[in-house]
UniProtKB/Swiss-Prot annotation:
Source organism (scientific name): Schizosaccharomyces pombe (strain 972 / ATCC 24843) (Fission yeast)
Protein name: ATP-dependent DNA helicase srs2
Catalytic activity: Couples ATP hydrolysis with the unwinding of duplex DNA by translocating in the 3'-5' direction; ATP + H2O = ADP + phosphate + H(+)
UniProt binding sites for ATP: G33, S34, G35, K36, T37, R38, R302
Residues covered by the UvrD-like helicase ATP-binding domain: 9-304
Amino acid sequence: METKSSYLKFLNEEQRISVQSPHKYTQILAGPGSGKTRVLTARVAYLLQKNHIAAEDLIIATFTNKAANEIKLRIEAILGNSEASKLISGTFHSIAYKYLVKYGKHIGLSSNWLIADRNDTQAIMKRLLDSLKKAKNPIASGIRGQELTPQNALNRITKLKSNGLLVKPGMDQLSLINGLEEPPKELQSHQSVELYRLYQTSLWKNNLADFDDLLLNFILLLQKQPDCVRNIKHILIDEFQDTSKIQYFLVKLLALQNSDITIVGDPDQSIYGFRSAEIRNLNQMSEDFEGTQVLHLERNYRSAKPILELALSIISQDKSRPKKGLKSNHISSLKPHYRLFETNNKESYWIAREIKRIVGSCPELIFYNDIAILVRSSSLTRSLEHALSELGVPYRMVGVNKFFDREEIRDLIAYLRVLANKDSTSLIRVINVPPRNIGKTKIDRIIFESERRGLTFWQTLNEVKNENILLSQRNDKSFLKSLKSFLCSISKLENRYLSNGHSATLSDLLLGILSEIKYYEYLVRKNKETVEEKWENVMELVQQSDNISCIFYELDYKISTIVLLQNFLTQIALVNEEQKEGESQKVTISTLHAAKGLEWPVVFLPCLCENIIPHSRSDDLDEERRLLYVGATRAQALLYLSSFKSVTGMFADMQNSDNVQDVSPFLKGEEMKRWVMESEIVFNEKIASEIGTILGRKSYGKITNLSGIGSNANHNGTKFENLGFQCCRVLAEAELKKRERVKSVNDYNKDETNFRKHNAKRSKTDIRSWFEKKQPIDSDVEISEPSRSASIMVANKDLNDRSFETVNRIVSTRASTTNASFMSSVRQNLGRGPSTKDQVINRTLREGHQDVVQHTDLNQSNTKVASARPAGSRKRLGVRLRVSRML
């Protein structure tokens, strides 16, 4: 634990003034990399120590659970665990949940309500839209005519809720929360209001509340029972520029009890307008709270000076922005690098090559996981993914394959929700998992009867079981038997683990579910190839349930299993589980929005074209500019920016019909040329020393600037296998495997001919002869142009377009990845988006082509030929070929 007030010694003058502010209302405007989390943490410690405020009398609102946990850990390091554990901290939603659990009865909430997460709300809305397809009334017809997707419909409802509009039982019109301004009338179309009413009724019936409801219900609670926050002395809010109208209204209600307010934010980083964030809240606070003191943090500890100069030149284009500076703590002689390319594909391959060049030039100084590629939207990653995969650059996508979104995990969570409160959405998901002869037709009929009779899905199931409700004229004994078996399993689990007198752990409950429904056997029947991977995920859930249980047991060792279960489900709904990555080095591909608050030593900002940034569908030019500013300020040492003139391939479908692109207006003008360089970065000891100082890395390997010029590129005199030769062999291998049916390889190869004699008659056996040849690594022998041309002809003649995509995946990894150390990561990236046939053949086989062959010097001397891949890889390639019907 740090000594009393020692945390103040690590602050600069600006930070110290902010931490010790005596003002009742304080705004701390913190630029990127200026230490806002440190200041917010120190401010909390200062209030607790110097102002003698009790920890339970402070509210700290953040925008992510990760940020809340980080602040709590830092407070714990300063003051100890006992004080930190008493803090009321978390996201607005999690804080609302804590108060609603404790005081929700004052606004009519039951004791066992649960949070509906994204999957639940999607399922509810899908069922509503499906039912409206059959309804015969004008409003239903109007909704059908709009052809809404579940997400579109939910977005409409969120818009209504974020403006404070409520559905009230028995009322056709929406009501506005007292104290809020009336929203535009166009928001409240008959169709939107009816969808909202039906959706909210479905939530109520299932005893659920969605995330928007948490904030609305918290407002209603504070208005009806303000004494529940009477003890709060100080409210601290992080990322204030991202607060919505509803969240700001909550802050005002919390402050009615004479609480002080400290906010930390940066108007230059307000990028969430599409989530109803209101940048105007900063100015509104100064108007609503008289005497608000505005303080600035302008010392940047993250980025090199040239990066900040470029970022400020971009954000300063907004003439309405209050002028404020940003001073760097790091000197660098390297300006941000800018390149303009003919096509998006050339841009992508250049980025992939440059990444390999950086890592190869700066050993032990810059690694793959130090590098990020940040794009305006996820739809722009296809070309980048493909280029990285072809050149053997390992990468990860941020925000995909979330743990709690995996099918097997969703199944088990649904079972837990059924046991917790008979949630209809979860019942519908698991009633036929594993299969029980209860198909979609039966489920739809049960849903219909539930809605017709005003019953919950669970109540209807029991009525059907007791034959009080008939789903068809004939008595379906098989269905009834299956239904009774399902209900019996649920009852058995309740009696065994949740009834009074039993104190089971959550892992006991989960293992009981797995045993009762024979889930492992179900996974085996479903897909033997994926069962082990899925079962590992299931066991991970069991382990996580125990970890979370321990936290609640520490708070209350007498906690019942049912309350423990409800808390566990709430944690799952509140926390956006991040995918657990291995320790392997990987480049990060992320959207600009997802990169907020993060940093990397090296950042690439590609696709900086008009209609991409600013986005063609955005009506807020200033927010788009702020988004680019946020992206630029993620970089610590090296920043690369790039644009292209035209698009090719599938990427073209998303852009202008003429495929012609203009550079982003944010990068135009003579002024911008002052802050960027277009020549290639030359790595040397001086540059490495500057980078090392910025990153705090004092020791690293020998710096060697790798540039690579065509076929003459080489490093330390080592010769490497010709990429075009590899590609020919792989194409030929695929062609041969397509014909290989009965004969063994040896029998097939009896009549070999020398493929290098290009004037010889080409036959099927020529192909085998060709791809078995190995280019001597230690010689200067090159493949002759006639031989290369002949192989192209074979590939074009015998490789049909239908199967080429699959072969291309093999070509991509084998032809472009000669470094054995990259093999593992490339295998993980197999199956990423392919190029067209002409692109691959031309790119990999044409002599002197700059997109692939240029940087052969980046490979290592332990190069292996394409056919010498690990057995597991060959097996996987074979499977892919069989799937594509090539074998």
